[in-house]
């Protein structure tokens, strides 16, 4: 498998967790290091570390039913053992409130930038998700 294929597979694994609800894989694809950081397209919008990112991704993916995503126009730039991936990202699903037994359809049209490092496999070192709608 080429580096480009491995990199896209890591990013797809992140979003596939929303479909499969296999959130254990999230710890495998993120760089567990103090240098890790992320910005989300959902609140809270502050800069997050590894642990907060994992917890919020787990919460997001278990709270959204019928989750789907589409990666469009990915641009992968590899610089030795680092890579930058920029893309358009569309996400849909039903945000479920299990206490109130209600659901709200959500759709996020956005952009995403990922920085990955190879140590020895590709891991996500930074995520920046942003909405371009609503």
Label every PLM stretch briefly.
Residues 30, 89-91, 128-131:
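Short beta-strand segments enriched in hydrophobic/aromatic residues
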Residues 81-97:
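A short hydrophobic beta-strand element
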Residues 3-22:
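Short, aromatic-enriched amphipathic alpha-helices that serve as compact interaction elements
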Residues 63, 92-105:
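Short, cysteine-centered beta-strand-loop-beta hairpins and adjacent loop/turn segments enriched
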Residues 84, 104-134:
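Short beta-strand edge/turn micro-motifs at domain boundaries
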Residues 65-68, 79-83, 102-108:
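A generic structural micro-feature
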Residues 46, 93-95, 132-134:
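A short local loop/turn or secondary-structure capping micro-motif enriched for an aromatic residue
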Residues 5, 23-78, 88:
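A solvent-exposed, acidic/Ser-Thr-rich amphipathic alpha-helical stretch
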């Amino acid at each position: 498998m080429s580096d480009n294929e491995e990199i896209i597979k890591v990013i797809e694994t992140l979003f596939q967790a929303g479909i499969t609800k296999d959130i254990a894989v999230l710890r495998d694809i993120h760089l567990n290091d103090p240098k890790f950081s992320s910005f989300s397209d959902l609140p809270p919008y502050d800069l997050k570390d590894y642990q907060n990112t994992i917890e919020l991704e787990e919460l997001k993916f278990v709270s959204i039913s019928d989750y789907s995503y589409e990666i469009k126009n990915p641009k992968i730039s590899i610089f030795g053992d680092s890579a930058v991936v920029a893309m358009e990202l569309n996400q849909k699903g039903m945000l479920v409130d299990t206490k109130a037994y209600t659901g709200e359809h959500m759709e996020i049209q956005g952009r995403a930038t990922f920085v990955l490092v190879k140590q020895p496999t590709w891991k996500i070192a930074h995520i920046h998700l942003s909405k371009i709608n609503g």
